[in-house]
């Protein structure tokens, strides 16, 4: 956290100036009891465009999974935004796209332009002068934007600026987060400052930025951390936050290793099944080695790993992290405290390991499987359908004898139709006529004698 002066400035002509004869120097350590007033020294505000928290006067950009406007509003309400001084760091106005900034821990107002080959905390993608925007929102007499509006401006301006800056090297799942740096309320009011810097940073523990070397487009942007790193959790949404924290603090995941896909796939992006098989095997081995002599099943945690998308692969990312954690049934994540290799707590309770599987059950001898001897199908299954000569005869049922050969049925069933004796009446129709045929009419009278 940035430091505030213990005494208010006494120079009425310049509220941002320190008392006469004293140098403006930050005090060591967080001291804000009396600093939440408009007379605080110059500060810079850093905002994460993709995740999270508007920070006033300190560098605590936390890239969360998804946006968290509720946390933003709650944080500002509980810790009002300190005003910044009217005097602006000279580097702030001289910086250009591609420049890199470095500052001591917690003092972004002391940012200086350095070579990107050296350690730095911020890479500038674009310097945006909001005075060029239409309307009166950024006019000379306009009030400073609210924290929620600053969040919105950052999302609208900085994400597009970073995409333009990196081009095909933009990795949407990069370990670097899109951020905004601006001078703050007092510079807005007293100096008419309307400039903001959109760029990239690497969030680190204790709400600080990790220093890195080289330009983002030229280095591996893979979102990985050393084994043993714990990643935070958003207490409001129960979602992971890709920021390292102390494992003794609440967190969502613990990193157990990293896998380099280029070792197996040096050329084109492998398919999802190919990635999954390779990463799963490698992560399983690494996690077993990381937890030894413990076993993953005794922690009741789950092995977690991502795969790479085409945009990430095109940007040059090749490495993924293996982690362990626990998900909830509602889509959230369990809150872990302490390392999985120690006194782990899951949602405040120690894990209850499942019963051990006896060794003899893990190595059961193979059981010989005796297949039944195939039997010939019974003759009844080979019977043909009822012959056409009988199946349509009215009031006559086909004769089916399963135990007889099928060829003996055809003549037997067809014989009655040809050899049936005629009825007693000599004038009846032939035997081939249907029994239900129309009866003969009355006999003609004998001719007269």
Swiss-Prot record:
Pfam families: Septum_form (PF13845)
Induction and repression of expression: Down-regulated upon starvation. Induced by albendazole and thiabendazole, which inhibit the GTPase activity of FtsZ and probably septum formation.
Coiled-coil boundaries: none
Protein keywords: Cell membrane, Membrane, Secreted, Transmembrane, Transmembrane helix
Record organism: Mycobacterium tuberculosis (strain ATCC 25618 / H37Rv)
Functional description taken from the UniProt entry: May play a role in septum formation.
Name of the featured protein: Uncharacterized membrane protein Rv3835
Membrane-spanning ranges: 45-65
Biased composition (Pro residues): 365-387, 437-449
GO cellular component terms, semicolon-separated: extracellular region; peptidoglycan-based cell wall; plasma membrane
Protein localization: Cell membrane; Secreted
Acidic residues bias: start-end ranges: 1-11
Recorded topology in the membrane: Single-pass membrane protein
Disordered: region residues: 1-33, 349-449
Extra information: Has been detected in culture filtrate but no signal sequence is predicted by bioinformatic programs.
Low complexity: bias regions: 409-418
């Amino acid at each position: 956290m940035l430091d505030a002066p213990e005494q208010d400035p006494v120079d009425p002509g310049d509220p941002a100036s320190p008392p006469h004869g004293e140098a403006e120097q930050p005090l060591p350590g967080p001291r804000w009891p009396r600093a939440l007033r408009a007379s605080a020294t110059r500060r810079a505000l850093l905002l994460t465009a993709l995740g999270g928290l508007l920070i006033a006067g300190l560098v605590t950009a936390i890239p969360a999974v998804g946006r968290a406007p509720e946390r933003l509003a709650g944080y500002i309400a509980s810790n009002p935004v300190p005003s910044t001084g009217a005097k602006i760091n000279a580097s702030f106005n001289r910086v250009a796209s591609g420049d890199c900034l470095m500052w001591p821990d917690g003092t972004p107002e002391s940012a200086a332009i350095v070579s990107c080959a050296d350690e730095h905390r911020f890479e500038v993608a674009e310097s945006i002068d909001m005075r060029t925007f239409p309307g009166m929102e950024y006019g000379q007499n306009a009030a400073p934007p609210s924290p929620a509006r600053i969040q919105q401006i950052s999302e609208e301006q900085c994400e597009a600026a970073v995409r333009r800056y990196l081009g095909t090297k933009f990795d949407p799942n990069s370990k670097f987060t899109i951020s905004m740096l601006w001078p703050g309320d007092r510079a807005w009011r007293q100096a008419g400052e309307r400039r903001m810097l959109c760029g990239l940073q690497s969030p680190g523990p204790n709400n600080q930025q990790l220093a890195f070397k080289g330009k983002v487009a030229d280095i591996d942007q893979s979102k990985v951390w050393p084994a043993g790193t714990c990643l935070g959790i958003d207490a409001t949404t129960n979602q992971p936050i890709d920021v390292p924290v102390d494992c003794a603090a609440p967190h969502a995941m613990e990193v157990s290793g990293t896998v380099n896909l280029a070792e197996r796939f040096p050329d084109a992006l492998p398919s999802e099944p190919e990635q999954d098989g390779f990463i799963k095997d490698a992560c399983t081995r690494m996690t077993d080695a990381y937890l030894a002599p413990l076993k993953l099943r005794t922690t009741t945690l789950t092995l977690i790993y991502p795969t790479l998308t085409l945009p990430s692969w095109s940007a040059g990312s090749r490495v993924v992290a293996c982690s362990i954690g626990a998900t909830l049934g509602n889509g959230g994540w369990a809150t872990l405290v302490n390392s999985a290799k120690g006194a782990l707590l899951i949602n405040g309770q120690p894990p209850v390991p499942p019963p051990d599987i006896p060794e003899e059950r893990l190595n059961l001898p193979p059981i010989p499987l005796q297949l039944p001897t195939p039997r010939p199908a019974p003759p009844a299954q080979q019977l043909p359908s009822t012959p056409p000569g009988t199946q349509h005869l009215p009031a006559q049922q086909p004769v089916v004898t399963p135990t007889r050969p099928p060829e003996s049925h055809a003549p037997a069933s067809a014989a009655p139709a040809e050899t049936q004796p005629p009825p007693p009446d000599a004038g009846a129709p032939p035997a081939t006529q249907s029994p239900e045929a129309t009866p003969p009419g009355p006999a003609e009278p004998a001719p007269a004698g």
